[in-house]
Swiss-Prot record:
PANTHER family: E3 UBIQUITIN-PROTEIN LIGASE TRIM
Gene name for this UniProt entry: Trim68
This protein's name: E3 ubiquitin-protein ligase TRIM68
Species of provenance: Mus musculus (Mouse)
Gene3D superfamilies: 2.60.120.920, Classic Zinc Finger (3.30.160.60), Zinc/RING finger domain, C3HC4 (zinc finger) (3.30.40.10)
Zinc finger region(s), RING-type: 16-61
Coiled coil stretches, renumbered: 144-226
Length: 485
């Protein structure tokens, strides 16, 4: 076999399957595969690679216990020898003697970037060049190597951050895409059920559902392809970066004569290398969950919700008709009755809900912060509260002007294209359904809490939050809808 081909085959065997360069601190896992310790540890830290501390081999996907990583010292020794052998073959330095003059290689030609002997210095090829003793430039180039490595390692850190960020963003997008898919299915099913109960035709709703699902699948495929191309580009950059780092590290550890051969060309490549910033991809979902006609159907369950002033935090000002609330300039002198919230800017509705379907809308205007939903009647009103169904709250919130979130244990970010100025809330007590809609853009679906049995009577929940800026002074106002019961 050709020695070069044989060498290439050997190098492949001692490459890490993740970074595609020589194994560094190789560790073997229970399935028998071997990786760089840093590559494996870094991969398992990325979002989505481990769920509930369940890890898998990147190659065969066999389950692996992360604490069972075994250092492979014998393979590490083999890798070092292969590195040295490959370096010698690449540099073409079989001995320390000049092939032409049979003299020791003791000089370095800066222009030609190569080691020479004393006789070469006098030859026509080098007579006008700066040819200096190796010992005079050894430390200079070792220092340059370290500077170049420092630069590349900083770029490597940025590349790693980019890869982690990309993986996190892709994971968030996949979660949002799955939620949108579920929302479309559930909302159209809800609408079909309501139409059937009213003995109205469902064909148009079924056609709209199929069109929405097809649109979402097309969007999913297009975005997934863009993400994959971007991921491959990031990996290619990382691999080039890794190979340059490995090359310079190898040089820094070799005898001076071998270190200097071709060093300037390697330094030039590393010093000019910078991480390329890729064109950003929009991960904003374009396919809305909007059911035409649903709002008109929900309005048939409209109720006349009014605020209960006895529950309002002392800084909240409730209007005389009990239909709006805003954060007051000063604290009011109000009795600390058991119903009143002591710590938080919360006020509840006065009507308890223990059965049936109910719908109401709230004008939030251009406020930068608010909270809406329902809570159980017996929530703690004096101590710290946690806005989660686990603690009796089904609430969505706006924070910092653009951050829409649902009050669950995961506290997910809600991707809204159009900021809602009016929010619709639908509660189906028997179906354990509490859903929110953006009335501003035609009643697109905002969020539905996972089906969770209500533990008791419920009350509408309102929070205008603080008037921290000029965009948070508009009152929260309960809207009047036709057909209120």
């Amino acid at each position: 076999m050709d020695p070069a081909v044989l060498m290439e085959a050997i190098v492949e065997e001692v490459n890490c399957p993740i970074c595609m360069t020589f194994l560094r601190e190789p560790v073997s896992i229970s399935c028998g595969h071997t990786f760089c310790h840093s590559c494996l540890s870094g991969l398992w830290k990325l979002p989505g690679e481990s769920q509930n501390l369940s890890y898998t081999c990147p190659l065969c996907r066999a389950p692996v216990k992360p604490r069972k990583l075994r250092p492979n010292w014998q393979l590490a020794s083999v890798v070092d020898k292969v590195r040295l052998l490959g370096f010698c073959m690449e540099m073409g330095l079989k001995t320390d003697v000049c092939d032409l003059h049979k003299e020791q290689l003791t000089m370095f030609c800066k222009e030609d970037d190569m080691v020479t002997c004393e006789a070469c210095k006098q030859s026509p090829e080098h007579e006008a060049h700066s040819v200096v003793p190796i010992k005079d430039v050894a430390w200079e180039y070792k220092w340059k190597l370290q500077q170049a490595l420092e630069h590349l390692r900083k770029e490597q850190e940025e590349a790693w951050k980019l890869e982690v960020s990309e993986k996190e963003q892709a994971a968030i997008w996949k979660t949002q895409m799955e939620r949108r898919k579920q929302s479309i299915r559930w909302e159209f099913e809800k609408y079909r059920q309501l139409l059937k109960e009213k003995e109205l035709p469902c064909q148009q709703a079924e056609e709209e559902a199929a069109a929405a699902q097809a649109s979402l699948e097309q969007e999913k495929g297009e975005t997934a392809s863009k993400l994959e191309l971007r991921r491959e580009a990031i990996i290619r950059q990382s691999q080039v970066l890794w190979s340059m780092i490995v090359e310079l590290e190898e040089r820094s550890q070799r005898p001076v004569r071998w270190m200097l051969q071709g060093i300037q060309e390697a330094l030039n490549r590393s010093e000019s290398w910078t991480l390329q910033q890729l064109e950003p991809i929009s991960l904003e979902l374009k396919t809305d969950c909007r059911v035409l006609g649903l709002r008109e159907t929900l309005k048939t369950f409209a109720v006349d919700v009014r605020l209960d002033p006895d529950t309002a935090y002392s800084r909240l000002v409730v209007s005389k008709d009990r239909k709006s609330v805003h954060y007051g300039v000063t604290q009011q002198n109000l009795p600390d009755n058991p119903e009143r919230f002591y710590r938080y800017n919360i006020v509840l509705g006065s009507q308890c809900i223990s059965s049936g379907r109910h719908y109401w809308e709230v004008e939030v205007g251009d406020r930068s912060e608010w909270g809406l939903g329902v809570c159980v009647e017996n929530v703690d009103r004096k101590e710290v509260v946690y806005l989660s169904p686990r603690y009796g709250f089904w609430v969505i919130r706006l924070r910092k002007g653009t951050e829409y979130r649902a009050g669950t244990d995961e506290y997910p970010l809600l991707p809204l294209t159009v900021p809602p100025h009016r929010v619709g809330i639908f509660l189906d007590y028997e179906a354990h359904d509490i859903s929110f809609y953006n009335v501003t853009d035609g009643a697109s679906h905002i969020f539905t809490f996972p089906c969770y049995p209500f533990p008791g009577r419920l009350l509408p929940y309102f929070s205008p939050c603080y008037s921290i800026d000029t965009n948070n002074t508009t009152p929260l106002t309960i809207c009047t809808l036709g057909g209120e019961g």
